[in-house]
Amino acid sequence: MSMRPKDLPPVPEQTAAVARKALPKGSLAIGVRDHLGGVFTDQPFAGVFGTRGAPGLSPGVLSLVTVLQFAENLTDRQAAAMAVRAIDWKYALGMELADTGFDHTVLPRFRARLAEHGLERAVFDRLLEH
């Protein structure tokens, strides 16, 4: 997997409109995106993921998935399913409504790679700083 560091993708207009209509009071995922979105950038992971090859999923997006997964006490399979079917997760992750998401096996590989490089606390520490 290669990476070109960036921030979270912008929330697509249609995704935002549907999320706001379906959840007028918001949700945990929407609140995290709106108030803490700047924490979930690729930059802290720049040394862990290469720049060659086809781009992989954004480490910033995967770290946001991991935080939402923990907050909602979900398995990897359930978290990957939420990215496909839950409008508030699509909003938080900056996904189009028709986006088919990612395979659940990406999540344990992502966590293992962070642990391999001593970055398992990187997102948590950034959340505390924010």
Describe each model-derived feature in a short phrase:
Residues 65, 79, 83, 103-107:
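Short, conserved catalytic/metal-binding motifs centered on acidic residues
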Residues 24-67, 71:
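Basic, short loop/linker segments at the boundary and entry of helix-turn-helix/winged-helix-like folds
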Residues 87-98:
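Short, basic interhelical loop/turn and adjoining N-cap
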Residues 1-37:
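Charged, often Cys/His-bearing segments associated with DNA-binding zinc-finger transcription factors
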Residues 96-130:
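Active-site- or DNA-interface-adjacent structural scaffold in DNA-acting proteins
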